Amino acid sequence: MGKIVSYTNVKGGVGKTTLCGVFATYLANSGRTVAVVDADLQQSLFRHRKRDLQQNPDASLPWEINTLRGRTPEETAIIMDNLKLLPYDVIIDCPGNLVDPNLEVIYSNADIAVVPIHYDSDTLDATQMFCETFKAHFGAKIFFVPNGIVSVEERREHLQQERDRAIELLKAYGTVTPRIKRSVVISDYNTLFPLTTYQRNAVKYAFEPIINELQEGGEE
């Protein structure tokens, strides 16, 4: 059977939805069958696909996307039970909060939680709060993906210290992947088209540890 991968964080602006869509396309381009569920109230990824289809109505779909909008926790539990029986991976774009009534059901069924982050103190504090709650109740393996990192700023001493502090702290909760640089090639992705060479190169080192976990095992 496939795995359930949740893209999640309570801190906005870290690129959760974008990375979720790019990850799904990366898997599809690598020959893996994958489906996506948009569980976020804003439905950003679902609307992104809708816009892409309006501009390219004859394009084939590299992956299907469905939503949980309007679903009760009881309905979501049935959906998750069915998703876990599928022979391929399912990627879920989770709500950016801890109060959505469906989150407990999603998290309890997830094999992997991917948490995009920035190195700043506000993001780190919010992420640590999230991890304390998550690790206390759920068994999914956590991968932190430093995303949208500005290379020039990363060389400044105080930002290097922020980065080192973030990595050291988060290692207590999960795996910190190589970072993804801030780049327009990522934000310009299309949910229908294969990733360009530039896009693949931008994310491949960050995605490799997650894909290895998909291939090797599920929950801890």
Per-range role (PLM):
Residues 148-196:
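Beta-strand-loop-alpha "switch" segments that mediate conformational coupling across diverse proteins
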Residues 35-36, 92, 115, 143-146:
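Structural beta-sheet core signal
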Residues 101-121:
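Inter-motif core of Ras-like GTPase G domains
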Residues 192-220:
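NTP-binding/hydrolysis catalytic cores, primarily Walker-type P-loop NTPases
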Residues 125-139, 144:
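Conserved C-terminal guanine-recognition region of P-loop GTPase G domains, centered on the G4
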Residues 106-109, 134-139, 170-171:
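Short, conserved loop/helix-junction motifs that constitute active-site signature segments
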Residues 4, 8-14, 21, 25-92, ...:
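P-loop/Walker-type NTP enzyme "switch/lid" segment
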